[in-house]
Amino acid sequence: MWRLLATLSCLVLLTSARESLHFQPLSDELVNFINKQNTTWTAGHNFYNVDLSYVKKLCGTFLGGPKLPQRAAFAADMILPKSFDAREQWPNCPTIKEIRDQGSCGSCWAFGAVEAISDRICIRSNGRVNVEVSAEDMLTCCGDECGDGCNGGFPSGAWNFWTKKGLVSGGLYDSHVGCRPYSIPPCEHHVNGSRPPCTGEGDTPKCSKICEPGYTPSYKEDKHFGCSSYSISRNEKEIMAEIYKNGPVEGAFTVYSDFLQYKSGVYQHVTGDLMGGHAIRILGWGVENGTPYWLVGNSWNTDWGDNGFFKILRGQDHCGIESEIVAGIPCTPHF
């Protein structure tokens, strides 16, 4: 009995010691500590010479906000594959492979939405309608329903706005693609890059209901609408079934400073300071070395993480990843 108590005491002491350790976000010490834990992922440097205020602003999702109506369950009788990647399932939909950059703005809530909406429009049209839905239009014109623009927002509000007001097209910064391309430039949060430095500053651009010069059709005629928007229960199989049937979804989770250093593998929180809530696009799932994961697209450019993507533990609502899933069905004709 005393041996069992001694073992339990040691485990408690080890856990307490680990939790009491503090590493500066983005530090070598944090990277080294993570990689010594023999966990399911590898850490490295993704951010160089950036203000911590910038990194915190990237996490611009207000968790636990307004809820959309929950979609009726339909996964019970479905037989789902052990792994699934929307990029491979719908190869004629190029937006699924795309990674965007939110720049110095807490607009992840808008990016997660417009990325998944773009994917779903293409999927529903069987590849006949390929459009980059405008993050700029969502960010600047949604208003109070979505939150506070570059200072943070609600994914549920974004999907509701799409069904009520519609969204125009718009590509990446300086792409001149679509009606309203993104106006906030990418910034250099990596090493030896050519982009301007990242800061925590940045106001929300103004809502402009005019397409950029030379683009047709008009702003009003360029709108793409959702016919429904909804939440999905915190159920692993229901989320998988939704992605399998209709395409990528938007999710949100709690970010700690160790996540900033993700390079490869299946992320599980190890240690680090709370950074905030972050919205992303979930596009598949799988199992890596026995660990189930969600396949996720981020909005921090392609030189973050695994070419802009990451994997996170699946099935345990890790960091709340399964608690705030939202999606919707486009009004795009179904072919």
From Swiss-Prot:
It catalyses: Hydrolysis of proteins with broad specificity for peptide bonds. Preferentially cleaves -Arg-Arg-|-Xaa bonds in small molecule substrates (thus differing from cathepsin L). In addition to being an endopeptidase, shows peptidyl-dipeptidase activity, liberating C-terminal dipeptides. Residues 18-79, 333-335 form a propeptide. Its EC number is 3.4.22.1. It is found in: Lysosome; Melanosome; Secreted, Extracellular space; Apical cell membrane. SUPFAM superfamilies: Cysteine proteinases (SSF54001). Keywords: Acetylation, Cell membrane, Disulfide bond, Glycoprotein, Hydrolase, Lysosome, Membrane, Protease, Secreted, Signal, Thiol protease, Zymogen. The modification N6-acetyllysine is found at K220. It is a peripheral membrane protein. CDD domains: Peptidase_C1A_CathepsinB. This is Cathepsin B. It comes from Sus scrofa (Pig).
